């Protein structure tokens, strides 16, 4: 095919043949040049009589992989054999095999990632996540006292799974588990654990999630220090317990999880309460409550007995009789005082009456004197006559004497000598 046709656009009327597509892709890929690529070996396919070997290199955080092709001598002549799960750095050139339409990296060098370098990366990640606050105790969620259902992420048929289930059932036989088995090492561990965590976190029946593995080498535990897993655990709404069981070099998951357990067995003990211990505690609390109640009753009985010994309760009528005598005495005093007061006031009234009688008009009238009043013709009130001008002849008079009054008329007046 001419370059002119190769550079033309494909159309329904002039489509490209497969060979042209593969040729164009091959030319574009081969322009990428050599690359250093890091990943985790997942499949190693080596045959003694093969000149070429085929491997799969997986991303450590995402479900992605790339095929590797390399001379068998590179693998055969290594001092330490390669195995699935090894973290490596490969040097190769992207290659596209036009005949089969497949992509691969043609590798000429494979180097294992050193433990020291991996640990340095883990510590760098640990510092970065700590600076973001993912290790902050304030953000850690409290575990439920008695979970309704426990989510368990662990390897299929592993000792960690057996330990968690057996210990939990021994402690609380009614506890329920939702178990999801995943890879716990190797390239597929991180994506599988993240997916299992997502499923359990969305299950409303699950109250707490345990991620368990029974220890292992530093290389085996690398998935539990991958950043993607830490982000997923930090974002989970359900409390997460890390039970990896590796004391010397703790994975980053131990710092991000809401609770770190030393071993899977320890995780079961921390998550599930012991029914025997709880019953014992209930019995102790019941005994303490009963003892406290008995003590209170005894104190109240003693106080009641002390009250009963008081004189007022020994003879309740004594204070009443005492008060009755006091009241009778007070009544006698009041009567005496009132009688004396009445007599004193009566004597005073008699004295005043005598004075009034002696000084009043009645006594004067009794001695022959009278009071003369003129009665006005206009009907107004009578006036006492003190001068002759007040009673001209013909005036109507009222003369008051000791035993009544006399109506008279003025016949005339006479001036005093």
UniProtKB/Swiss-Prot annotation:
Against CDD domains, the record matches this protein to: ExoVII_LU_OBF
Q: Where in the cell is it found?
A: Cytoplasm
The Enzyme Commission number assigned here is 3.1.11.6
Alphabetized Pfam families for the sequence:
Exonuc_VII_L (PF02601), tRNA_anti_2 (PF13742)
Keyword Zinc annotated: no
Reactions the enzyme catalyzes: Exonucleolytic cleavage in either 5'- to 3'- or 3'- to 5'-direction to yield nucleoside 5'-phosphates
Could you give one GO CC term from the UniProt record? exodeoxyribonuclease VII complex
- Which molecular-function annotation in GO is an example for this chain? nucleic acid binding
Its GO biological process terms?
DNA catabolic process
Which keywords does this Swiss-Prot/TrEMBL entry list?
Cytoplasm, Exonuclease, Hydrolase, Nuclease
InterPro entries, per the entry:
Exonuc_VII_L, Exonuc_VII_lsu_C, OB-fold_nuc-bd_dom
Any transmembrane segments, and where? none
Which HAMAP family did the record assign? Answer: Exonuc_7_L
Q: How does it assemble?
A: Heterooligomer composed of large and small subunits.
| Similarity annotation | Belongs to the XseA family.
Function comment: Bidirectionally degrades single-stranded DNA into large acid-insoluble oligonucleotides, which are then degraded further into small acid-soluble oligonucleotides.
Q: What is this protein called?
A: Exodeoxyribonuclease 7 large subunit
Where does this protein come from, organism-wise? Corynebacterium glutamicum (strain ATCC 13032 / DSM 20300 / JCM 1318 / BCRC 11384 / CCUG 27702 / LMG 3730 / NBRC 12168 / NCIMB 10025 / NRRL B-2784 / 534)
The top of its lineage is: Bacteria, Bacillati, Actinomycetota, Actinomycetes, Mycobacteriales
């Amino acid at each position: 095919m001419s370059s002119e046709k190769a550079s033309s656009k494909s159309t329904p009327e002039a489509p490209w043949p497969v060979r042209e597509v593969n040729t164009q892709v091959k030319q574009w890929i081969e322009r990428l040049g050599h690359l250093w690529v890091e990943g985790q070996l997942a499949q190693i396919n080596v045959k003694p009589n093969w000149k070429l070997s085929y491997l799969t290199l997986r991303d450590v955080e995402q479900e992605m992989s790339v095929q590797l092709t390399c001379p068998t001598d590179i693998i055969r002549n290594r001092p330490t054999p390669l195995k699935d799960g090894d973290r490596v750095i490969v040097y190769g050139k992207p290659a596209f095999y036009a005949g089969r339409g497949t992509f691969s990296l043609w590798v000429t060098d494979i180097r294992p990632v050193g433990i020291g370098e991996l640990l340095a990366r883990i510590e760098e990640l640990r510092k970065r996540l700590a600076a973001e606050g993912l290790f902050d105790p304030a953000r850690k969620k409290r575990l439920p006292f008695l979970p309704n259902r426990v989510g368990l992420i662990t390897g299929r048929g592993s000792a960690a799974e057996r330990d968690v289930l057996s210990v939990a059932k021994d402690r609380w036989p009614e506890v329920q588990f939702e178990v999801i088995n995943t890879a716990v090492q190797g390239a597929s561990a991180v994506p599988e654990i993240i997916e299992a965590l997502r499923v359990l976190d969305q299950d409303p029946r699950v109250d707490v999630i345990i991620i368990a593995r029974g220890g292992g080498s530093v290389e085996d535990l690398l998935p539990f220090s991958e950043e993607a897993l830490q982000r997923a655990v930090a974002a989970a709404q359900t409390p997460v317990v890390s039970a990896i069981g590796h004391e010397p070099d703790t994975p980053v998951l131990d710092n991000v999880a809401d609770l770190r357990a030393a071993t899977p067995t320890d995780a079961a003990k921390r998550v599930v309460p012991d029914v025997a211990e709880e019953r014992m505690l209930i019995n102790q609390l019941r005994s303490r409550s009963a003892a406290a109640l008995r003590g209170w009753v005894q104190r109240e009985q003693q106080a009641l007995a002390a009250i009963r010994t008081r004189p007022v309760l020994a003879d309740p009528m004594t204070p009443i009789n005492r008060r009755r005598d006091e009241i009778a005495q007070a009544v006698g005093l009041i009567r005496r005082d009132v009688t004396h007061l009445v007599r004193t006031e009566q004597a005073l009234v008699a004295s005043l009456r005598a004075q009034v009688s002696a000084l009043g008009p009645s006594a004067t009238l009794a001695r022959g004197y009278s009071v003369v009043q003129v009665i006005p013709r206009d009907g107004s009130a009578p006036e006492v006559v003190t001068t002759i001008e007040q009673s001209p002849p013909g005036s109507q008079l009222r003369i008051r004497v000791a035993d009544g009054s006399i109506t008279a008329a003025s016949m005339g007046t006479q001036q005093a000598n």
